[in-house]
Amino acid sequence: MSSYVGVLVSDPWLQSQFTQVELRTLKSKFYSTKTRFGRVTVKHLPPVFAKLKYFNGKFDENEIKTILDESYPNRAKEVEFETFLRAFLSVQSRGSKGASSFLKTSTTTFHHSINESEKASYVSHINSYLKDEPNLKSYLPINPTTNALFDLVKDGVLLCKLINIAVPGTIDERAINTKKELNPWERTENLSLCLNSAKAIGCTVVNIGTQDIAEGTPHLVLGLIFQIIKIQLLADLNLKKTPQLVELVEENQDVEELMGLAPEKLLLKWMNFHLKKAGYEKQVTNFSSDVKDGEAYAYLLNALAPEHSTNVTLEIKDPSERATKVLEQAEKLDCKRFLSPKDIVEGSANLNLAFVAQLFHHRNGLSDESPKVPISVAEMVTEDEETSREERCFRHWMNSLGAVTYVDNVFEDVRNGWVLLEVLDKVSPGSVNWKHANKPPIKMPFKKVENCNQVIKIGKELNFSLVNVAGHDIMQGNKKLLLAFLWQLMRYTMLQILNNLRSHCQGKDITEADILNWANRKVKKSGRTSQAVSFKDKNLANGIFFLELLSAVEPRVVNWSLVSKGETQEEKNLNATYIISVARKLGCSIFLLPEDILEVNQRMMLILAASIMNWSLQQQSDTESTVSDDTDVSSVTEEISNLSTDDGSSDV
C-alpha cells in the first residue's frame, strides 16, 4: 500500500509558498539527485530545475545557472532541502511578472550591495561589547575594512553572544558549541540556536536560513546584526524601564497611549520633545530625510548638553561641515560610534536611529522628579506577569510568520483587525476575503469593526471557541479575549503542522492527548523513567522530563553533565533555561521563557512538547523520503498512527 507523508519545512513562511503537491515533487527531485550524486550542490540545481514543468519554456539550463550564480556563487557548496526550495523561488521570481515585491526581496539576493559604513558601525559595536568575551578574544577586534565579520559569524558563536548582549539570558551559553574546531553538525546547531533565539527576541528572520549564515551572505548577516543591535539600543524605550518618559505625555494624551507606542516611535517622540523645548520649529518624523541637514541634531545636542552648547553648528551652511561639527559635539558625550558626517548627509536611517538611541542612553534629559500625572505610572506599567509574558510570546510568534505588519504591542496593534487578518492568512492561506478587508490607516471605527468581525468569522470556521465574542471586543482591546484568541490560533497552527504529517492516514486529527502520549512513549522507549500525567503536571517544573524527551529524539543534543536534579529553585531555573536553548539548538522555534516551565504554564508546555514532536517526526519523514513510495509501512506512519492507541486518555 502506498503511503503519503506531508512535507514540512521549519520556516512557516517558506512552507506557505508551496502546495503539498509542489513540495512532494520538489522533495522527490531533491532526494533523487542526492541519491544519484551522494549530495546535492549548487552545480546540480540548473539541470534539475530546467527539467521541471514550471520552468519549461521560460528558462534553459544556462539561464538558470546565471540566475543562481548571483545568489549562490559557490557552486561546490552543499545544498539542504530548504535552500533547494529557496533557490527554486529565486529562479521563479525571475520568471513571474506577477511575483510580489516581498517575494523578490526576501527570497533572492539580486542587486544587494553592502553599505560599508553600516558594516563598520556594526563592527565597532561588536568590538566594543564583545571585547572581553573569552571565546572570541583571539578574533577581536574585527577589522572593519575587511570581510572578517562575515567569516566570523559562520559558526554562530558571535551571533549567539551578541543576542545575549541585546537581551541578557536569552541563550543558555552552556548550550553553545564553543570548541575551536566545530564539525558541520555542531555549526548547524549553533546557527539554529542563533536564528531561533533571534526570533524569540523579536527579529524577523523569515528570509534567513542557517545556510545563509554559514555562507556569510553579507546583506543577510548585516540585516540580522542590525536587528539585534536595534533591539539592544531600544530596550529602555518603555515606561517600565524608564518611567521618566511619562514626561512626554501631552495634555490631550494619556499614559496608556504613550505605552502603546513602538520603541522607535517613542524615540522620535522623545527627540521632538527636546527639539520643541529648544526652539526647533520642525517636526522630525523619520531618521533619514528629516535629519540630513544636521540642524535637528544641533538643537538636540544643545538641549541635552547645555554645558557644550554652541551656536557655531547652526551658523554653518554646508551640510557636511555641519554634520562634522555635530559629531564633534556628540563625541563629548561619547556618542560617535555609529555615525559619520556622510551618514548624516545621506540620511542613513539605520545608523541615524542607532545614533539617536545612543544619545538617549547616555543622556535622556528627562527629569527625575515625579511628574504631575493623575495616575500612578507604576500602576500603569505593572501588569500581571503571566499576561505580559503571554503577550511577548504571541507578539514574537506573530512576527516570526512573516506578515507584512510588524507587531510592537499586541494589545494595541491588533485592534483594527488588519494584523490578525494578515496572521490568519499566513496560518490558513485563503481564509481571508481581502475584498472585504479595510487596510490601515483606518479612521472610521466601524471599518475597524468590519475587519474584527471577519477575524471572528474565520476563527469560528477554524472551530475556535468564541462564544459570545464579537469583533467589537477585539477593537476595544479586551486583553483576556485577545490572549485566548491568539492561544487558539497558535495551537491551531501547531496542530495543523502535525496533522500534515499524518495526512496519509484515515484516523482522527492529532489532539493534545496524542502529543502527551507520544512524548511519554518516546521517553519510556529511550530507557528513561520520567512520565508526565498532563501538561499541568507540577513535576514538569524540574525540567527532567523535557530534557529526557529532547535526549530521546536526539541523544547527542543534551549534555547530561550540565543537568541538575532540579530539587532547588536555582537548579530548576538552570534546567529550564537549558531546555529552551537545547530545543532551539535542535531546530524548534519556540517563544516561551524559563518562568513558563518553572510555573508549568499548561499552554506553553503543550507548545514545547508539540514543537519537539514536530521536529522528531519531520526528521524521520526526511529520512524516509529516500525510500520508495511502495514501502509498506514507514516508521513515521506507524508512530503517528499509534498516537491514539494508548490505553486511557490523559488529562492535558
From Swiss-Prot:
Keywords: Actin-binding, Cytoplasm, Cytoskeleton, Repeat. One of its GO terms (molecular function) is actin filament binding. Residues 640-652 have a biased composition (Polar residues). Residues 623-652 are annotated as: Disordered. Residues 116-364 are annotated as: Actin-binding 1. Residues 388-617 are annotated as: Actin-binding 2. This is Fimbrin-4. The gene is FIM4.
